[in-house]
Regions:
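Non-catalytic beta-sheet/beta-sandwich ligand-binding modules that flank or precede catalytic cores
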Residues: 2-255
């Protein structure tokens, strides 16, 4: 996955659209999801990753419609930017409700049918209304959907997750299509740090590959990781091998 120079570059390089819609859980959101939305326990969960960060005040459940294989359509019970709620993360919208069953009438498409606005302050605000994306099936594994450099004034803030070491020189945020953990449900550790590969491109065009010096943004149950680097040579791509992490449904990650 190519690393963008930041949220501004991501916004400038693509039109407003959903990048992914991931059928994460089918009638299986845990009891704790009631904190996100009263009555969410036992419902479906579908994180939708957007091309731009969005204005939370423009989000309403009625802005989204989930279409099933049969053609039937549902409006979510609720939508939320949690748990991916730290600074500059507000592009993953969790849809909660009844979106069909994986085995007989699965969801196939998410439509944005009303105004969902970007939170741009230094560029033109964009509207996601009229856009759509195909749904990634329940039994598919999670994958990295985007990666972007994080400004120091953001990564140096303390958020809900763990922080990069103070000696960190550069941070890349990796966003997955859905939340990921180890197969035993533990958080990522040292072994997974060494599985992340970051490509660097120097000013003279020479390239090299490193592992992150540390992983951060852990422990907050969202779909973002910080790759903390101890070099100032710009990061230009990120990779993580298949088969090491699982989504909440227990499906192993793809490449």
């Amino acid at each position: 996955v190519v690393v963008a120079e930041g949220a501004q570059q991501l916004a400038a390089e693509q039109s407003a659209r959903p990048l992914s819609a991931f059928f994460g859980l089918d009638n299986n959101l845990p009891f704790g999801a009631n904190v996100l939305c009263l009555g969410a326990s036992g419902e479906d969960g579908m994180p939708v990753v957007l091309s731009h960060t969005v204005n939370p005040d423009s989000l309403q459940a009625e802005d989204f419609r989930v279409v099933r294989q049969s053609g039937a359509a549902n409006t979510p019970m609720c939508v939320t930017l949690r748990p991916a709620g730290d600074m500059d993360e507000n592009r993953t919208v969790l849809l909660i409700g009844e979106f069909g069953n994986a085995d007989d009438d699965p969801p196939v498409k998410v439509l944005i049918v009303d105004d969902v606005l970007s939170d741009a302050t230094d560029s033109a605000q964009v509207n996601f209304r009229g856009t759509q994306v195909s749904v990634i099936p329940l039994d598919a594994g999670p994958e990295i959907i985007l990666a972007a450099a994080v400004p120091k004034d953001i990564w140096s803030l303390s958020g809900r997750g763990t922080s990069c070491p103070t000696a960190t020189k550069q941070v890349v945020r990796v966003t997955w299509t859905g939340g990921v953990r180890l197969p035993n449900r533990d958080e990522l550790g040292e072994a997974q740090r060494t599985l992340y590969k970051v490509s660097l491109t120097a000013a003279d065009g020479s390239r090299s590959e490193v592992n992150p010096a540390a992983l951060a943004e852990l422990g907050d149950a969202d779909n973002n990781h910080f790759l903390c680097l101890d070099t100032t040579t710009p990061a230009t791509a990120v990779a993580f091998p298949a088969g090491h992490l699982v989504d909440p449904n227990g499906d192993l990650n793809a490449d």
